[in-house]
């Protein structure tokens, strides 16, 4: 027994020198727990001790967490001595006289305390430290039988948090002497047995702590560490890694730490100081060199760890890869590889044709039967594996099965390309079906419910169809499922935007109708309050248009399942579009022509009608001139109101957005995805020179105002002249007394007509007919008929006169003959009548 160095930090409980009879670690039989300082957890015959938990429970100073440390190295390098000095354990050490094997199997002890040089008040973690002493390698007792030392090293690596690799300084740089060959085997098997667990727990690592003994100081520790690190990385690169963990690096599994110890005999005090310095690294949590990192722990309680350790040993003990491959296995590997290569070669020829069939099927308009396609995949794969079984099943079973699995993976990998063709086609056709469903307006329930139902049903149908051709899950469907779900979400998102834009369009239409009515009413009689009324109406209609979507918190929810950010963008778009609509309506109702018509209407209302709406009849020019001036002033009162949008307080109407900014117009043209909006923002905008662009409130430019004023003045002056001319005509007409003179001088003629019954009756008939036509509003048509008859008679008379006066003898004779013929006919008629 070696004496325990002091000082030590003793964990709560008994002192290190508890009164138990020591049991030599060279003993090869399990003994009762209550008399042990250490327990042999695996004996030299590879038997696992099931009393570990009882021992740990009896020896632990307190309940709580624990740390597992093991030591690994060549025989007789002082592993047990190091543990005893460092962790105050009582492992049996080598008899230096006989130099024979001391530790057999694997032993464990609970550390009573850690040797250190920390201050008395330094923080000491409360964990129990469990120390495993592993049988040394390269011992003469076992000779060339390396099976146990490989398994023991792998067990220590798999169950420990910190694996202390104990070696002499002179062993650094050696391959066998530094146990690099053994480490290579252990690393390789560790990958095959426990590598997959690394994929599920990416943070877990094991610390390889290299303790270099008898360090003279000539070679710096950094150089020794670099040599060991290079050797380990070279070994790792040469490992035969399983395919699923081949991408993982050495750093993903292990951390490295190094510590040197002076010669125990020649520099004993220095040796003890170095041990205490190493102990500090296990205790001082505030130090950067603290060795117990959280990701080294197995994250299971001690009861679970003992079960885990037993299962690890069982798996390690029954794994044949730790033995050198036999000739039978070598032959099996060669033959199975040969058969597998032949089978795969035949399959590769067929798979090329299968790919062509897949391309043709996806390009055809006929629907694909995915069930039959999947059965075809299975039959083809099964046929290849049956051919392999026929030629390879007679060899070593484990090799045959391993190579069969490899062949199946290669088949799956080849069929994956064909599967991808069908899967991409399925994605496309399924999305088209969903798109058609989205475009249909007949939906039951809310939009969100309808979309959720459509998404679930389409995703279910897609997954079912994809599963039919996935060889019962052997082919990787995840990329296509992920792509389909992403595209499906994108389709739904686009439909949400369509619905959102539809809501905004309806709201803008409602706003347009309300504002149009308001404009008509206000422009019928403009006043100083016109723009106050229009702006008030605009704000009221804008708020009420989306009022039903407003939440109690003051936000807006359009009930489409859109994100709050999208709702805010929609609100901003509506805000901009509403101001743009107001601007468009202003310029629709207040253009140059419309303004001129409004001024003319206002002038006519005042000029042609009085206050009661009765048409005016001007008697003299003085009255006309006064009314004209008043009417013109009344009309022009609306001119400044309708050329500048100004409120009653004198301020101009200023919009919330610059509705004439082209960039803003494109940005708020419609509600879009945030990504699309950002991409468009990054585009270069075509800009024009907007320096001469007038303000929102300036409805007409100065040139347009001048043009309207000129036209208005010209047309009003024309009306004035026309009206004045009618007055002048009225003044210059025949005096009324002339009619009295005519009546007096023509009295006899009037009386003659009245006394003659024929003329009187004719006069009565003409007066009656005139009255009837007047009452039936037929005087106009009658006058037109009379006028046309007069025109026809006049035209006929002119033609006859022209024929008569033509200076042509033949024509004159012909005309005379016609006239004679007519006379004869008249003579005949007269004769007959007589």
Swiss-Prot record:
Name the UniProt record assigns to this protein: Protein SEY1
Acidic residues composition bias: residue spans: 676-689
Record topology, Lumenal segments: 755-757
GB1/RHD3-type G domain: residues covered: 63-296
Gene that this polypeptide is encoded by: SEY1
The EC number(s) this enzyme carries: 3.6.5.-
Family matches, as InterPro entries: G_GB1_RHD3_dom (IPR030386), P-loop_NTPase (IPR027417), RHD3/Sey1 (IPR008803), Sey1/RHD3-like_3HB (IPR046758)
Keywords: Coiled coil, Endoplasmic reticulum, GTP-binding, Hydrolase, Membrane, Nucleotide-binding, Transmembrane, Transmembrane helix
Ranges per topology, Cytoplasmic: 1-733, 779-834
Keyword Chloroplast: no
Family the entry assigns: Belongs to the TRAFAC class dynamin-like GTPase superfamily. GB1/RHD3 GTPase family. RHD3 subfamily.
Primary residence: endoplasmic reticulum
One GO CC term on file: endoplasmic reticulum membrane
Chain segments annotated as transmembrane: 734-754, 758-778
Taxonomic superkingdom: Eukaryota
Keyword Transmembrane annotated: yes
Cysteines paired by S-S bonds: none
Short name of any one Pfam family annotated for the protein: Sey1_3HB
Cited function: Cooperates with the reticulon proteins and tubule-shaping DP1 family proteins to generate and maintain the structure of the tubular endoplasmic reticulum network. Has GTPase activity, which is required for its function in ER organization.
Annotated membrane topology: Multi-pass membrane protein
Coiled coil residues, start to end: 659-688
